[in-house]
């Protein structure tokens, strides 16, 4: 069942009147947690590079976990961060893999959204390769407003005021308007 956002019209009117308040995609981060190093991690790395056209980085285990046979510092995951038009185009394909539906609980209080893809072969344009196998992945979309650079720059750094931060509802409205996503309860 689709979720109705009560102040959707008000948010859209605010963006129309103030273009600097309209959100945009800062980055899209794709993570594949394999849970082990070796051949399977290398295959995940190859698959992620084919999907994004960018070289992924390896993520290391923070703690030793004997039950899973993981040592601290051992590479167990790969991730890639996309920005700009590349991120926008890939996000369209990734949303198609989940039928353009996102849970309301997938959004955090700052409007960012994360969702999972169970099998990478669900993404349009991706063929099954028996050499690589099938991998699932986590996709995190970070949204920002124009002007967020003041928090990251080296000189004259400043905090983002609360009134300029994104809300959960604004993140939902942005995804609905920009990508035609249906937000469901959950």
Curated annotation (Swiss-Prot):
Superkingdom classification of source: Archaea
One record GO biological process: translation
GO CC aspect terms: ribonucleoprotein complex; ribosome
MF annotations from Gene Ontology: rRNA binding; structural constituent of ribosome; tRNA binding
InterPro entries xrefs: Ribosomal_uL5, Ribosomal_uL5_arc, Ribosomal_uL5_C, Ribosomal_uL5_dom_sf, Ribosomal_uL5_N
Family annotation (Gene3D superfamilies): 3.30.1440.10
Stretch forming the signal peptide: none
Pfam families recorded: Ribosomal_L5, Ribosomal_L5_C
Keyword terms: Ribonucleoprotein, Ribosomal protein, RNA-binding, rRNA-binding, tRNA-binding
Homology family: Belongs to the universal ribosomal protein uL5 family.
Complexes and interactors: Part of the 50S ribosomal subunit; contacts the 5S rRNA and probably tRNA. Forms a bridge to the 30S subunit in the 70S ribosome.
The protein's role, per its UniProt record: This is one of the proteins that bind and probably mediate the attachment of the 5S RNA into the large ribosomal subunit, where it forms part of the central protuberance. In the 70S ribosome it contacts protein S13 of the 30S subunit (bridge B1b), connecting the 2 subunits; this bridge is implicated in subunit movement. May contact the P site tRNA; the 5S rRNA and some of its associated proteins might help stabilize positioning of ribosome-bound tRNAs.
Protein name as annotated: Large ribosomal subunit protein uL5
